[in-house]
Amino acid sequence: RVEVPAVELDKAKEYTICIRPIIIRKAYFSKTKKVLEKTYKFYPVPESNIRAYHIADAHNNIEEPIKAAETFGDIDFLILNGDVIEDSSNPKNFMNIYEICSRLTKGERPVIFSRGNHDLRGNFAEKFADYTPTHKGNTYYNFRIGSIWGILLDCGEDKNDNHEEYGHTVACHIFRERQTDF
């Protein structure tokens, strides 16, 4: 994971992603391919007349939210506000988040992402932060894009932790208390 300060990205107006595919990973003398690079333009959020698009509760639907967003034209940033995936039962579901981001921003616009309550359900829920954007592993954070300052809080689930639906697999109350210290 790499975090680039927004102010630096805003100044540079571009960034380059570099990867080196691994053919065989060994303890010694791993085999790799050449480094691949792709440079993206980046458009900072303007100071006024800001256009944002907000998607929530897509539940693994990709085409409908993208088509709806495209009817509004160019955006300055994208907000993905939880439950973009149906649940965390399959790590392939996480790619839906990136598919929507990629198609709507082309890597050129900021994205604000938050976890939803359905994202806490499924075999990979505990690994959610491994697959999605976080700030130092936390799903709550503050941010600044352009003239917008924000704080994103994550309430976790929508019922008490002891609700039978969760089968003793969540501890959101403690998580919410930790955020009050933040």
Predicted regions and their residues:
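Acidic, histidine-bearing metal-coordination/catalytic regions of metal-dependent phosphoesterases
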Residues: 1-54
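Extended active-site neighborhood of metal-dependent phosphoesterases/phosphodiesterases
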Residues: 20-30, 95-182
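An acidic-aromatic substrate-binding cleft motif
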Residues: 31-81, 86-87
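Short secondary-structure boundary/capping elements
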Residues: 60-63, 92-93, 135
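A short acidic, amphipathic alpha-helical/loop segment
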Residues: 64-69, 93-100
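Short glycine-/acidic-enriched loop or helix-start segments at secondary-structure transitions
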Residues: 64-65, 89-90, 123-124, 162
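Short, exposed beta-strand "edge-strand" segments with a Pro/Gly-rich flavor and a Y/T-containing core
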Residues: 87-88, 173
